[in-house]
Amino acid sequence: MEDKQETCPKGDSDFVSDKVNFKTEEDDDQTPCHSLEQVDFKSESEDMRQTDSGDEQADIRAASCACQPSGKFLAAESEDDYGSLFSQYSSTLYSVAMEAVTQSLLSSRHISSRKKSPAWKHFFISPRDSTKAICTYCMKEFSRGKNEKDLSTSCLMRHVRRAHPTKLIQENGSLSAGSSFSPPSLLLPPQPADVGDLSTVLSPVRLVQKMAPKIPSPDQIMEESVTVVSSEELSSDVSVTEKYSREEALAGSSPNLSMLHYDDASETMADRNLSLPKSTSGSRRRSAVWKHFYLSPLDSSKAVCVHCMNEFSRGKNGKDLGTSCLIRHMWRAHRSIVLQENGGNTGIPPLYPMPPTLLPALLPPEGDLNSASLSPGKQVKESPSASSSPERLPEDLSSHTNPGDVSREDVSMLSSSDDLGEASVVSSPEKQPADTVNPRFESGTVFQQNKKVMRRLKSEVWHHFSLAPMDSLKAVCRYCSCVISRGKKGDVGTSCLMRHLYRRHPEVVGNQKDFLGASLANSPYATLASAESSSKLTDLPAVVRKNHQGVFPTNSKKTSKLWNHFSICSADSTKVVCLHCGRTISRGKKPTNLGTSCLLRHLQRFHGHVLKNDVSEATLSRSPGIRRPLGIELSGPSSFRDSTEKFYDSHPVAKKITSLIAEMIALDLQPYSLVDNVGFNRLLEYLKPQYSLPSPSYFSRTAIPGMYDNVKQIIMSHLKEAESGVVHFTSGIWMSSQTREYLTLTAHWVTFASAVRPHCEDHHCSALLDVSQIDCDYSGNSIQKQLECWWEAWVTSIGLQIGITVTDNPSIGKMLSEGEHSSVQCFSHTVNLIVSEAIKSQRMVQNLLSIARKLCERVHRSPRAREKLAELQKEYELPQHQLIQDVPSKWSTSFHMLERLIEQKRAVNEVSIECNFRELISCDQWEVMQSVCHVLRPFDAASREMSAHMSTLSQVIPMIHILSRKVEMLFGETMGIDTMLKSLKEAMASRLSATLHDPRYIFATLLDPRYKASLFTEEEAEQYRQDLIRELEILNSTSEDTATSNGCDSGSPLKDTGTEESLWSLAPIKRDQREKLPEDMVLAYLEEEVLEHSCDPLTYWNLKRSSWPGLSTLAVRFLGCPPSTVPSEKLFSTPMDAGSFGQPRLMMEHFEKLIFLKVNLPLICFQY
């Protein structure tokens, strides 16, 4: 085979051709009508080949130049056909490679030093890099060495021995059978009887590569292709009979050249093409899955699904490609297609005898069929392998069908098929019947064929759904009219639709035949099917038929019986809520990897009796002779999803729904008669038909009182965790819209390590303890008795101490001071009094507020003014805000009203003029308004700062200093409001001077690491430091007395329980009797740097508990008290303004419990 090579110029056309020998044999064992004609191509291209005999050269010239049929050589028309065939490759992914291969072979004919090895019969030099070679069988590139001076063919031969061993066997056989002058031809093995045999075939790429040396140049190929195609276009008006006669004559001129016959589904006629001989080299694209995929025209390592047109990778590199991803995609996304094609047969369909072609068929643009004459894609007429469907066309589609006879119904397909018009599609060439005649068909017919096959492969789920008219990515259920998304653009499927059927309409699924039968056992999807079925057996009862053993494939994640006891948390999908105790349990950290192990452990630990009931029911369901409805089997033995049986009262789902309804009554302060409302009952009947709603008396006598007792016990357990054993309070008198007055008491404490709230970074805790109605003519004694009663029930009875009580009512504060209870005034209430006095002190400011108030009221009442204001806001690009109407008794609302008017100044002026308002704001008034806002802004910020949840008493003194300095600065920054500023200064001095010298505020400020002694003078700092040391000594003495009373005497000797004399008593023990003195702790604390204002002081003292335990306890006593009652007032502001506490709606004896639940349920995170 390495002998000689012949260079044979071709007359005038300069066509260089090697010897091409075609030897065809027919398989006599096959039926004459279905005989498979086979062709063997053998080509040899050696650089230094000696000249053959003159007769042989003459024959080659006659075959290549004169184009006359001669024996075993190719005819001219056949050569033109091959030119047209090869022209298809020039515009595809492989066209560049093929042209480069041709040029490389033609240009390197006279180079004899590098291609003497037998490896060059299977490789050619890469046109991009001369140190690399490309395999002619698999088109993979291999390196021959690092530099051009040291090149070898060891890697090349190794690749041939490993990847293509049969090529070497064929080569050796041909050497023994023939001579060097007469190239031998390989005899094709007989066609096996089993069509599904996995015998290997010769790839079309090899065909192209073996014939590449016969290609003169890409330009000549294109010219010949144009000639052939143009002649076909011009003769389009010729009758079909004449076309057949011409083809038969051409076939008769070269009887030894056999052709493949393919089934034409659109015209039931055949097209001729060259047959590819079988090989034993082992093609990688022979799997049955290639009926549903074709190779991507842009990347040969990827495949495109013909159903959803999605692209999938077959491997990371070109050396390790497979079909596992393709099989997995078909099983997950198009399972119904797989089951449909395997459901009626005893095995998988026969595999392809040939791999799919690597090149796509290029469809011409619509309406311009002639434009394809210059495109290699026109070759689509020659081979049905260019069809967009990889599956063998069914016999029922082989009737005479013309492109114009395609019905409009064929166009309305799955929405995924709408994207096929733009895609270049390739099928897997399958063996077709050989007794049919194959005329050339138009590209439009191919596209219509594709649509017909696509519709036949349409998923069965579309019998139950229809595409949404407004959005093609969604489908509408035919039973419940629900709109379900099919995925994102470019990645649509039917998984969500199947899941909807299994969850909402299992009875429809039950009426269908088994989707997974025994016929799927031998298919590529058997592994996936068996794995999925085995994973479902533990959670889903098997639905077994007489003749089929399998389960319904379901994608639902809630098939486990555990979901009868849990529901997915609405706030976080990775967590679930137990229907028995209401606890939140995590299912995993990653949303893509969630499980039910934690759910099972929770039931085993806290609700073991529930699992026992499930086991007994499961045993009953598995008893012979008992058949359960399909819906109950699919959703678990304890599920009542599709059953008409009502829940019993102790059922976990019924108990959870009843508890949620009771929560709704408490949180929204709804009357108990809500459960009798028709609309509410209809809603529950639709959401959960198996649930029976209890009567109103059940909620008023059982549900709400029981919930109140549970929440009260939880609040008590929280109070026991208070640090330093001190609880602070806020108390006040709250008036409802019914002119009823209520006394409230709210507790505030600090918790560092809570067993109820683990991993909680917020150390500030609060809870509403009680609410009680009082008479309008209440006295201080009655309030004191009520508070003493509450403190005894909530605080002193569990060993806690009563701390500081913050109130905005002067009478309550006076009463507490007389009763030896520590109390302070609400800072926010004091600021309100100061600002209100300052506003009333200057008449001009009052007149300005009156004008602004009337102007805003007119705009709110006039639709014309509102529309004009909106137009001017758009014209002047102002914020689209409405004007604010203030409440005269609340200065903060007046401040926000003035700020909004200044923001909309330009629009407000024009609206006032165009709408003829009597209230017009002058330029001087606008300036005064800005000055008033400038003064009120720091006081508004101070009120909001001190009303925050984490604010403490330590912030009061720093805030007073800040406001005093700001007022001094405002005298030079404002105009026209000096009287107001003087009133502010005097009111602050009279109302806040006592606070600056209050030891409780001073200690709180010193113990706050953000301030310490930075706000005091040196004399004051030294005095307050000594006071703090004495306070700490008093606290230590109290704690030592408590420790001695508990029996923890440090001086008592240690005694061994085992013997009277302990050996350890002989060891010398040295104890450090020197403990940290209060003075040392205080000095060490004050010497540290001051922290930033954003830091939490309680977090700081939590870290210092081990270093300074006594000082940390003292700090918690003062820093745990809030400076304002506003946080407590916010809990009652909404119902008071809504005016929903009418006597007909709520019974007064129940109102106290409802308001208690309304406030505390969110505070304990509904864990009761």
From Swiss-Prot:
Covalent cross-link (Glycyl lysine isopeptide (Lys-Gly) (interchain with G-Cter in SUMO2)), residues: K42, K489
Binding locations of Zn(2+) 2: C305, C308, H329, H334
Any one cellular-component term (Gene Ontology): nucleoplasm
Region span, Required for homodimerization and nuclear accumulation: 1083-1168
UniProt KW keywords: Activator, Cytoplasm, DNA-binding, Isopeptide bond, Metal-binding, Nucleus, Phosphoprotein, Repeat, RNA-binding, Transcription, Transcription regulation, Ubl conjugation, Zinc, Zinc-finger
Annotated residues for binding of Zn(2+) 3: C477, C480, H500, H505
Ranges of Polar residues composition bias in the record: 370-390, 1040-1049
SUPFAM superfamilies: beta-beta-alpha zinc fingers, Hermes dimerisation domain, Ribonuclease H-like
Skewed-composition ranges (Basic and acidic residues): 37-52
Residue numbers of Phosphoserine PTMs: S623
Region annotation (Disordered) ranges: 22-55, 362-443, 1040-1059
Assembly: Homodimer; via C-terminus. Interacts with MYH9. Interacts with SAFB/SAFB1.
Function: Transcriptional regulator that binds to poly-guanine tracts in gene promoters and activates transcription. Able to bind single- and double-stranded DNA and RNA.
This protein's name: Zinc finger BED domain-containing protein 4
Lineage of the organism: Eukaryota, Metazoa, Chordata, Craniata, Vertebrata
